[in-house]
């Protein structure tokens, strides 16, 4: 401590000059000394600094001194919290590689048996959340094998179907991005089965048409605002089913029209007769598209599209609202009004999707925007530049058979 004071690294009134700390650490040349310096800095900052900005600076020193901390400190929950907060801050600001770096160090601070609540410094909820968040961040950066390894641990140790649902969704997204839609859909169907919804059985267009007509009969007799005002279920299983169904719709849309048709009907039935969930705003747009295209049922299609707009306005979830807005404006909106009228909403969706960190949502939104600009006859040089530049941060986007193929075609 006297050495820190004499070198003006620690001020006597307990106010830190963090830039001096960083300079002192970077001036050292021996690896072990640098690591030890970061350890000392992190300990000093933990003792004297407690505001948000200092916690983010502290996280870097904790990460760089992690080996010493792990060898000397048994209970590391506070260190994990600091690293977790830093990862969240980095992710929200768009620094996703930095966020992954913090997540990895946070994982390293877990105990040897991090899933057993009976062990010291082990908390099941924390371990579950950390594995899923790290896997999702690793996938978004193209580290698919790392993500799958983390997800496997969740499947192995997760206590309930709800606990494992997010892991199944991420696994499905990984395979969908790789173009392996059957394995992607299998992951989601397995998740739904664990949640008590069995949709894997064979079906036919005739059976789906019968189910559609039964649903149509109910919707024709129901006031649209009654459906719009239906409260979100408080049952976590029902809420989770809605999330997984929305993901399944996005997978089947691209290469399995029959299953997509079946899913759209089942999603609406679940919302009406089991319990409400926010993702129905996406399901309404899909079902409206089916009514328009397969049955030329303009009355029901318009009713469903109006319901979708009403539900989007009420949707409390940014992710669902962004995705629902893209589905509505690109697949339904142009059937109800001028195509140019959908452009502002798509522009907003592009900006929002890039902050969500989901490569699929970002790519679908960008490709929808590119196609709309092409259809409206915008300057082709600008359209081409948009296609080249907007998706450049998405790994291997041109090989993605969903939004990537559309964007390549426009370009």
At which residue positions do the language-model features occur?
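Short secondary-structure boundary elements
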Residues: 1-101, 105-113, 194, 206-230
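Amphipathic alpha-helical segments of tetratricopeptide repeats
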Residues: 6, 43-47, 63, 67, ...
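Alpha-solenoid helical repeat architecture
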Residues: 12-13, 51-56, 94-99, 118, ...
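Tandem amphipathic alpha-helical repeat scaffolds
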Residues: 24, 60, 64-65, 85-92, ...
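TPR-repeat structural position
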Residues: 35, 55, 76, 93-96, ...
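Primarily a tetratricopeptide repeat
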Residues: 36, 40, 60, 81, ...
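Amphipathic helix-loop-helix modules that constitute alpha-helical solenoid scaffolds
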Residues: 63-71, 77-81, 176-262, 374-388, ...
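Hydrophobic, small-residue-rich alpha-helical packing segments that form membrane-like cores
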Residues: 268-275, 287-399
């Amino acid at each position: 401590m006297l050495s820190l004071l004499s070198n003006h690294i620690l001020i006597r009134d307990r106010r830190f000059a963090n830039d001096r700390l960083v300079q002192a650490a970077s001036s050292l040349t021996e690896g072990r000394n640098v690591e030890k310096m970061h350890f000392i800095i992190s300990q000093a900052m933990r003792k004297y600094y407690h505001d948000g900005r200092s916690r983010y600076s502290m996280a870097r020193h904790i990460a760089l001194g992690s080996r010493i901390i792990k060898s000397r400190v048994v209970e590391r929950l506070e260190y994990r919290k600091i690293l977790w907060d830093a990862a969240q801050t980095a992710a929200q600001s768009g620094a996703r590689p930095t966020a992954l770096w913090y997540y990895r160090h946070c994982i390293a601070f877990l105990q040897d048996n991090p899933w057993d609540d009976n062990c010291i410094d082990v908390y099941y909820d924390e371990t579950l959340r950390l594995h899923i968040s790290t896997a999702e961040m690793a996938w978004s950066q193209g580290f698919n094998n790392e993500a799958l390894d983390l997800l496997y641990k969740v499947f192995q140790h997760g206590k309930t179907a709800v606990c494992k649902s997010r892991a199944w969704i991420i696994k499905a997204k990984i395979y969908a991005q790789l173009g392996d839609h059957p394995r992607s859909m299998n992951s989601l169907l397995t998740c739904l089965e664990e949640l008590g919804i069995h949709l894997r059985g064979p079906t036919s267009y005739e059976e789906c048409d019968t189910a559609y007509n039964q649903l149509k009969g109910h919707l024709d007799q129901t006031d649209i605002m009654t459906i719009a005002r239906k409260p979100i279920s408080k049952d976590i299983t029902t809420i989770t089913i809605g999330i997984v169904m929305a993901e399944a719709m996005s997978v089947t849309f691209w290469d399995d029209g029959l299953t997509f048709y079946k899913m759209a009907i089942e999603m609406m039935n679940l919302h009406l007769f089991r319990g409400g969930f926010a993702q129905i705003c996406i399901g309404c747009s899909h079902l409206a598209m089916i009514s328009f295209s397969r049955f030329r049922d303009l009355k029901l299609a318009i009713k469903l599209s109006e319901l979708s707009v009403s539900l989007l306005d009420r949707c409390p979830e940014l992710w669902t609202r962004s995705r629902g807005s893209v589905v509505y404006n690109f697949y339904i909106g142009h059937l109800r009004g001028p195509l140019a009228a959908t452009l502002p909403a798509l522009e907003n969706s592009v900006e929002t999707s890039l902050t969500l960190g989901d490569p699929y949502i970002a790519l679908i939104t960008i490709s929808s925007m590119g196609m709309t600009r092409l259809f409206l006859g915008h300057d082709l040089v600008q359209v081409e530049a948009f296609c080249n530049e907007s998706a450049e941060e998405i790994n291997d986007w041109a090989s993605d058979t969903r939004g990537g193929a559309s964007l390549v075609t426009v370009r």
